[in-house]
Amino acid sequence: MEAPPVTMMPVTGGTINMMEYLLQGSVLDHSLESLIHRLRGLCDNMEPETFLDHEMVFLLKGQQASPFVLRARRSMDRAGAPWHLRYLGQPEMGDKNRHALVRNCVDIATSENLTDFLMEMGFRMDHEFVAKGHLFRKGIMKVVVYKIFRILVPGNTDSTEALSLSYLVELSVVAPAGQDMVSDDMRNFAEQLKPLVHLEKIDPKRLM
């Protein structure tokens, strides 16, 4: 969807290690409009963006116990928009004083032959889905509210059905490593969304 924001830190002999700080929750369909109204009041004074994306998750199995995972995403409603390749590292859950999940994040725009390239590299597609929703911004924070649709016929994004009767809500910041104070701002913002949605530091391993 989005490339990491540009930082003002000088790059000296290498790339900046970017981290994603994340809080997650969900709302039932009937609460969506109330949440959208609240976010319009709390977020930056600009019209929220809408998105309709097709995401494919690729795995590469090797010597390690768990496969290497890459995510390829393209916009379905913006002609000519580049594909995006995303890598998300293992979450750092240990620090109880940190109010958000933290994981390494690499997000780059690519050419449209991305999926062919991944297959040539030995990756295989594990699953795919369509995500449709709204994107809000509050300073460097990003809030996405979206519904996931399963693809009924592999590769056919016109044949989908909703995965659940709820919308996922994600509050995130992409920043250089060591900027843990952003999790305090995220927690304060999340408090303002209660009781409509409870955004939490969720360990993905608990969902498996």
Curated annotation (Swiss-Prot):
Principal location: nucleus
GO cellular component: core mediator complex; mediator complex; nucleoplasm; nucleus
Single Gene Ontology MF annotation: transcription coregulator activity
UniProt keyword terms in alphabetical order: Activator, Nucleus, Phosphoprotein, Transcription, Transcription regulation
GO biological process, alphabetically ordered: positive regulation of transcription elongation by RNA polymerase II; positive regulation of transcription initiation by RNA polymerase II; RNA polymerase II preinitiation complex assembly
Any Pfam family: Med18
Location(s) in or outside the cell: Nucleus
Modification Phosphoserine occurs at: 66
Oligomer and partners: Component of the Mediator complex, which is composed of MED1, MED4, MED6, MED7, MED8, MED9, MED10, MED11, MED12, MED13, MED13L, MED14, MED15, MED16, MED17, MED18, MED19, MED20, MED21, MED22, MED23, MED24, MED25, MED26, MED27, MED29, MED30, MED31, CCNC, CDK8 and CDC2L6/CDK11. The MED12, MED13, CCNC and CDK8 subunits form a distinct module termed the CDK8 module. Mediator containing the CDK8 module is less active than Mediator lacking this module in supporting transcriptional activation.
Family, as annotated: Belongs to the Mediator complex subunit 18 family.
Function: Component of the Mediator complex, a coactivator involved in the regulated transcription of nearly all RNA polymerase II-dependent genes. Mediator functions as a bridge to convey information from gene-specific regulatory proteins to the basal RNA polymerase II transcription machinery. Mediator is recruited to promoters by direct interactions with regulatory proteins and serves as a scaffold for the assembly of a functional preinitiation complex with RNA polymerase II and the general transcription factors.
Record's protein name: Mediator of RNA polymerase II transcription subunit 18
